[in-house]
Every structure is written in structure tokens, then in C-alpha cells.
UniProtKB/Swiss-Prot annotation:
One cellular component term from this protein's GO annotations in UniProt: cytosol
Keyword Disulfide bond annotated: no
Residue ranges, compositional bias (Acidic residues): 302-312
Primary location class: cytoplasm
Organism whose genome encodes this protein: Rattus norvegicus
Gene that encodes it: Igbp1
UniProt note: domains: The UIM domain is required for protective effect on PP2A.
Function: Associated to surface IgM-receptor; may be involved in signal transduction. Involved in regulation of the catalytic activity of the phosphatases PP2A, PP4 and PP6 by protecting their partially folded catalytic subunits from degradative polyubiquitination until they associate with regulatory subunits.
Location of the region described as Interaction with PPP2CA in the Swiss-Prot/TrEMBL record: 99-203
Record's keyword annotation contains Plastid: no
Site (Cleavage): F256, G257
Domain UIM: 47-61
Alphabetic keyword roster: Acetylation, B-cell activation, Chaperone, Cytoplasm, Phosphoprotein, Ubl conjugation
Protein name from the UniProt record: Immunoglobulin-binding protein 1
Length: 340
């Protein structure tokens, strides 16, 4: 009797789902920092409720891959979103030391949700790469011509289609929300409402997985230099190299010196006087002032040279005048009367 009373006190599956879904909606519009205590408490609470809901779904065996989407009751379609909600809440956990674990766990939740929707043919989409289908994807890509260009074009087209579908789904959901939540909608509208939610979360999950893969790559690339430095530090240290001097540089230093100018210790005159004092230089090596006779002889020679130059100029002038006269007075110019 006590056990049955405890079971009645436990929250039921609809309550777990609606409470956790409401917590996620509150977190989506919250203005507080994601790392605040209030936000993280709601994240932990939502994950705890969804974990219980997932356990109940597993015990009830509510979904089976052997059945079609039409065989699932309309009211039970919403429980297919449990893994997607788990992935969304896991992404909101803030712990830098466990960020990689959170990303990998969130990716597993999103993949689980997408796999279920793919099996039930909720919408047409391509499953992201996983460990199970990675070999098939690699084989298909290797057989394609220009795989990078084709993959980029297909991804771009898929994003455009998802964006269009997202706008259409959100518009249709806003039209059905009030009727379904108030209980006035019939089974057909309820079914359409939850199918639209599933398609909306398919687009969200695909976008989140792309973002997760990029962040995981960044985190792994950031940790790889640390691992390399740790491996290098574990290697035994080599003895330091001894300095050596090149023979060429040593010989060059002997010829040209050390490469910097030496400072003078005396002037040239001081050096000359010092050598003359010790008899290291002959007397004729020192210039003496000229004598008076030498000056007179030099002056006479200079005067004679000037006189010779003047005589040469006069003689040259006479010769030029004589040449000019011969040009104007040809031979026989003065004896014209005796011409026969």
C-alpha cells in the first residue's frame, strides 16, 4: 500500500515533459548571464526531469522502429522531442573544464533525436556523420567528382531549405498554438501541431550539430600544442653545445684588428719631435725656412721668365703683322708701270 502511494506521488510523464519544456522556454528568453546561479539551477533541474522522462519512455517501450509514424498516437508524438530538449539544455551548461564532454553529450542527444525522426520519416533530411555511417559517407564522397565543391553546394542549399521551412513552421505553429493548448483542437490539428514541432527541432538539431562539430575541432586543435609540448618536455635534455671560433674570423682579426677604431695617443708633430729627439730621423727630413740668397735667386729667375714671355709675345705680334701685310700686298704689287 505504501509503495502504491509513493508511485502516485511521483510526477507522471506528461508533467515531466511539460515542466522541462517550460524551463527551456524560460531559459531561451532569459536576460541573465548563462553562467549565473539561477540559470544553471534551471538547466540542472530541466536535465534531471528529462532524464526521468527518458527512463519512463524506455520502460514503457513507447516507440518502436517496427511501427510507422501513423501508428503513434497524436498525443505521444511530443515525447519524440525528449532527446532534442536534452541536447538543448546540455548546450547551456557552463563549465570550461568539461566543455568538450558537454558538447559530445549534446551531440549524442541530437543524433538520437534525428535518428528517430529519420526512421519514422517525419521529414526528409540527411543524417549527420556518425561512427556508424562515416564509412558509407567516405565511400560515397570518394566516388564523387569534385567532392568539396559538391558538398559545399549541397550544404548551402540545405541551409536555404531549412530556413524557408523554419519560417513556414513557425508561422503555422503560432496559428495552432492557442487552440491546442486550450484543448479546443481536434485530433488532426493536435497531430499537425506536434509534427510541426518535430520538424522545427529537426532544423534546430542540424544547426546545433554543425556548430558543435566546429567547436569540438577548435577545442581539440587548442589542446594539441599542449600535448606536443608535454611530449617534448619528457624527452631527455641534451648537453649544451660548446662555443667555437671559426679559423677564418680569427685570422681576419689578426690582420684587421678587432673591428673597432683605436684612439690616438699623440699628434703627428709630437711623434716627429719624439723620433728626432732620439735620432730616429735625419735632419734633412725636417723642412727649414729658405735663405735670403735663395729668395733673390728665385726672384731673378721669376723676372727673367716674365721678360722672356714678353719678348715672345712681341715677336709673335711682329710675325702676325708681317703675315697680314703679305696678304694685302701680293708679289709685284708696286711695279705695275713696266708691265708689257
Amino acid at each position: 500500500m505504501a509503495a502504491s502511494e509513493e508511485e502516485l506521488l511521483l510526477p507522471r510523464l506528461p508533467e515531466l515533459f511539460e515542466t522541462s519544456k517550460k524551463l527551456l522556454e524560460e531559459l531561451e528568453v532569459a536576460t541573465e548571464p548563462t553562467g549565473s546561479r539561477t540559470i544553471q539551477d534551471k538547466v540542472s533541474k530541466g536535465l534531471e526531469l528529462l532524464e526521468k522522462a527518458a527512463g519512463m519512455l524506455s520502460q514503457l517501450d513507447l516507440f518502436s522502429r517496427n511501427e510507422d509514424l501513423e501508428e503513434i498516437a497524436s498525443i505521444d508524438l511530443k515525447y519524440l522531442m525528449v532527446p532534442a530538449l536534452q541536447g538543448a539544455l546540455t548546450m547551456k551548461q557552463v563549465n570550461p573544464s568539461k566543455r568538450l564532454d558537454h558538447l559530445q553529450r549534446a551531440r549524442e542527444h541530437f543524433i538520437h533525436f534525428l535518428t528517430q525522426c529519420h526512421c519514422y520519416h517525419v521529414a526528409e533530411f540527411q543524417l549527420p556523420q556518425t561512427k556508424n555511417n562515416s564509412a558509407e559517407n567516405n565511400t560515397a564522397r570518394s566516388s564523387m567528382a569534385y567532392p568539396n565543391l559538391v558538398a559545399m553546394a549541397s550544404q548551402r542549399q540545405a541551409k536555404i531549405e531549412r530556413y524557408k521551412q523554419k519560417k513556414e513552421v513557425e508561422h503555422r505553429l503560432s496559428a495552432l498554438k492557442s487552440a491546442v493548448e486550450s484543448g479546443q483542437a481536434d485530433d488532426e490539428r493536435v497531430r499537425e501541431y506536434y509534427l510541426l514541432h518535430l520538424r522545427r527541432w529537426i532544423g534546430i538539431s542540424l544547426e546545433e550539430i554543425e556548430s558543435i562539430d566546429q567547436e569540438i575541432k577548435i577545442l581539440k586543435d587548442k589542446d594539441s600544442p599542449r600535448e606536443e609540448s608535454a611530449c617534448q618536455s619528457s624527452l631527455p635534455e641534451k648537453p649544451p653545445m660548446k662555443p667555437f671560433i671559426l679559423t677564418r674570423n680569427k685570422a681576419q682579426a689578426k690582420v684587421f684588428g678587432t673591428g673597432y677604431p683605436s684612439l690616438a695617443t699623440m699628434t703627428v708633430s709630437d711623434w716627429y719631435e719624439q723620433h728626432q729627439k732620439y735620432g730616429a730621423l735625419p735632419d734633412r727630413g725636417i723642412a727649414k725656412p729658405p735663405s735670403a740668397d735663395f729668395q733673390r735667386a728665385a726672384q731673378q729667375q721669376e723676372d727673367q721668365e716674365q721678360k722672356d714671355e714678353e719678348n715672345e709675345e712681341k715677336a709673335l705680334h711682329r710675325m702676325r703683322e708681317w703675315d697680314d701685310w703679305k696678304d694685302t700686298h701680293p708679289r709685284g704689287y708696286g711695279n705695275r708701270q713696266n708691265m708689257g
